[in-house]
């Protein structure tokens, strides 16, 4: 069974992340917030595709569901300045 920490590690091994937080407690369903400079200039679909590419075959084999919020560093900064 996969842990949230393992999933974070898999993503950060293949994607530059300024911030990442993965939650999940059943080993197959996860929620993630991922902030990466690699998302700059990309649509949300392209950002998600980049995360899927970072996970490779794990998306088909180990992970049943991944709900994610992807943000550029600038968007993350704006979000945090509002709070």
What are these regions (language model features)?
Residues 7, 11, 47-61:
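Short, non-transmembrane amphipathic alpha-helical segments
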Residues 28-32:
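Conserved loop-to-beta-strand segment in the C-terminal subdomain of adenylate-forming
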Residues 33-46:
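A short interface-forming secondary-structure element
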Residues 1-27:
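N-terminal first-folded block
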Residues 23, 33-35, 69-71:
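Solvent-exposed beta-strand sheet faces enriched in polar/charged residues
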């Amino acid at each position: 069974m996969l842990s949230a920490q393992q999933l974070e590690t898999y993503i950060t091994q293949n994607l530059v992340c300024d911030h990442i937080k993965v939650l999940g407690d059943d080993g197959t369903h996860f929620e993630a917030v991922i902030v990466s400079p690699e998302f700059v200039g990309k649509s949300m679909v392209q950002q998600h595709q980049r995360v899927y590419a970072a996970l490779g075959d794990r998306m088909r084999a180990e992970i049943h569901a991944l709900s994610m919020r992807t943000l550029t560093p600038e968007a993350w900064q704006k979000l945090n300045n509002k709070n």
